[in-house]
A protein has these predicted regions:
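Carbohydrate-binding surfaces of carbohydrate-active enzymes
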Residues: 1-54, 59-278
Length: 278
């Protein structure tokens, strides 16, 4: 069964790879919200590998829906993919909401934007900016699920400072190399979407973390001076293994090699392999 699921996952990732290949032939880039938030049968990190601009999403504050941070910030997949695959621009569908409507303002939205920046998002796409023809009645035709930001918003003419603040943060955060403490291996990545909803406990304790997949462990990771390093300059202090009894032989062999090279590994000891070996 594992091999069947892995095949399905690989075929989905191949779809994203081919889409990117076709786009590049025409001088275009791809931006894919390939991380959900809904469950699918694929390694979403691998799908984001083939997105030039990985994309997540986060929701505005509300007392009626998606109340907790884990429900609101669906960003860690896209951020992790950006880090492990060397993509400096990491975007998000931003301030999504199904209410309150026409009540949000910059003062209300700023803490949410700041949290998204701290999570690793550095490019915002307002969800939504309704394009309403000038002849329609104000505030215009809108999509039901969004924080409505457009020229018909009452505070639009006073929003220069707010937009400048967002723009400056995005520019600065797209520079340099991210500093991340821990990488968490999520196994095959199939049927693991729950792990991607923001694990606020780690961040609230002051630790940054990325998720990594088998592809990155096998093809990109090395150990230098006790740190787990990637070719793009990002390094981690330790690798955390998933709470699973089985890991593929290929990944186990690479992890053993990393331990011999001085890497720190934390997690339960695997007791079996998964799938057919080679």
């Amino acid at each position: 069964m594992n091999d069947y699921k892995q095949t399905v996952s690989d075929l989905i990732a191949e779809h994203y790879r081919y889409q990117q290949e076709v786009a590049h032939k025409d001088g275009l880039l791809t931006m894919c919200e390939a991380s959900g938030p809904h469950q699918n049968q694929s390694d979403a990190l691998l799908c984001q590998k083939y997105s030039d601009v990985p994309m997540g999403e986060f929701w505005a504050r509300s007392k009626t829906h998606r109340i907790s941070l884990k429900q609101r910030f669906l960003t860690k997949e896209a951020v992790s993919a950006g880090h492990i695959y060397g993509k400096n621009v990491i975007s998000a569908e931003s301030f999504t909401s199904v209410g309150p409507q026409w009540e949000e303002d910059p003062y209300f939205l700023k803490p949410t934007a700041d949290r998204a920046f701290c999570e690793g998002i550095n490019k915002l796409y307002f969800h939504t900016y309704p394009h309403s023809p000038s002849l329609t009645a104000k505030p215009g035709f809108v999509y039901y699920a969004g924080t409505y930001i457009n020229r018909n918003t009452t505070w639009w003419n006073y929003s220069l400072d707010w937009n400048t603040y967002l723009a400056r943060n995005q520019y600065v955060l797209q520079q340099g190399t991210p500093v991340v403490d821990v990488c968490i291996y999520y196994g095959t990545g199939i049927e693991k979407r729950i792990q991607y909803k923001q694990d606020s406990a780690l961040m609230d304790l002051g630790y940054q973390y990325d998720y990594v997949n088998s592809d990155v462990i096998l093809n990109q990771m090395s150990v230098q001076d006790g740190k787990i390093c990637l070719p793009n300059g990002i390094s981690y202090e330790l690798l955390v293994l998933p709470e699973e009894s089985g890991i593929s032989i290929e990944v186990l062999e690479k992890i053993r090699e990393m331990v011999y090279d001085g890497a720190t590994i934390v997690g339960p000891r695997p007791i079996c392999s998964i799938g057919l070996y080679k």
